[in-house]
From Swiss-Prot:
Stretches the record annotates as Disordered: 22-41
Membrane keyword on record: yes
Keyword check for Transmembrane helix: no
Organism: Cupriavidus metallidurans (strain ATCC 43123 / DSM 2839 / NBRC 102507 / CH34)
Protein name according to UniProt: 3-demethoxyubiquinol 3-hydroxylase
Membrane topology: Peripheral membrane protein
Coiled-coil region list: none
The encoding gene: coq7
């Protein structure tokens, strides 16, 4: 029962944007630069950071579901450790959205519920499949973050610092999942994940 209460609290905080980072925000070492962006650039960066915030909401749901369905304590511990770092990402993205005078996606409860359901399916397929799903998810997120870094205004070093640290963490999470025994996912599954990602990114940019 205590575990369920704790996990429910994690879900509520992720959806409500009430998470707190354990690590320092990478942007804290930089001076505020938002005022150097024109209104169009600020709207664009807000859209990108909203997408990244949604991605971290989904990451919390995925890791939570896969942790609850893991077959072994080792995999459960690995999912828990990664989820804590992803919680840092969630808090950093929320901080940046506030700095930009923007907001998270209004559809966060929907994104969370959908990602949790997918995580349960991956977890029930077994630890090797679940770890493979983590590895593929992190690979796609790495590419997505690289794309966002390319699309940031040159003056926005604060968002850049956050996304670069997030990308480094995602690469490490993916490598850890593969090294722990994650197996490659079938091509159709990878393609379906990419389609779902495009739907999320297109919608979250605006809503």
């Amino acid at each position: 029962m205590d575990t369920l209460i704790r996990e429910f609290d994690v879900a509520l905080r992720a959806i409500a944007g009430a998470t707190r980072a354990e690590r320092a925000n990478p942007a804290d070492r930089l001076a505020p630069e938002t005022e150097q962006m024109n209104p169009e650039e600020r709207r664009h960066v807000s859209g990108l950071m909203r997408i990244n915030h949604v991605g971290e909401v989904c990451a919390q749901a995925l890791y939570q579901a896969q942790k609850l369905t893991a077959r072994t304590p080792a995999v459960r511990a690995q999912m828990d450790a990664a989820a804590k770092e992803e919680e840092d990402h969630l808090a950093w993205c929320a901080d940046r959205l506030r700095e930009l005078g923007s907001r998270p996606s209004l559809l966060n409860p929907v994104w969370y519920a959908g990602a949790f359901a997918i995580g349960v399916l991956a977890g029930r397929a077994g630890d090797k499949v679940s770890l493979g799903f983590v590895a593929e998810t992190e690979r796609q997120v790495e590419h997505h973050l690289t794309s966002h870094l390319d699309r940031l205004p040159t003056t926005d070093s604060r968002s850049r610092a956050i996304l670069e640290q997030m990308r480094d963490d995602e690469v490490r999470h993916g490598d850890a999942a593969r090294n722990a025994g994650g197996i490659p996912l079938p091509g159709p599954v990878r393609a379906l994940m990419q389609v779902a990602s495009r739907v999320m990114t297109t919608t979250a940019y605006r809503i």
